[in-house]
Amino acid sequence: SNILNEDSLGYNGKYGFGETDKDFPADAFILNPPYSAEGNGMVFVEKALGMMNKGYAAIIIQNSAGSGKAKSNNIEILKSNTLIASIKMPSDIFIGKAGVQTYIYVFKVGEKHENDHVVKFIDFSNDGYKRTSRKKSKNNLIDENRAKERYQEIIDLVKFGAGKLNI
């Protein structure tokens, strides 16, 4: 792996250590861009996807990233990447840190998004966890309703679709 803590807009796509003159052939990434950045953070997504030839990407992004200021970024992204799923996350997922509704966008990298491609829109606002914002609590995340199983179900939905699952 090549795990780096860098400014992703300034990242040149090279290995961060070892053979630093060679391109790192990433085939997967997870990104949580700053939502206040250009295009509601989608400028980071566009750059990261543009550095890959193939693979998959998961983006944790605010709900407004699908429209408005991000529209031109999204058009460019979909010219060479397919949106597989848009997953609505719980509104309190960043409780105590941020109060923004977030989604996870899952992309297949290197394949143009065709107009007839079916995107999976998944409402995961009830993930089974209860969150608290108590500062001194040892556990601010309580599994109240099969949370681990629910997260596995989301993975299976994205990978296989509802037709292959017993839901």
Where does each model-flagged region fall?
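A conserved structural/catalytic subdomain of Rossmann-like adenosyl-cofactor enzymes
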Residues: 11-167
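Conserved SAM-binding strand-loop segment of SAM-dependent methyltransferases
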Residues: 2-8
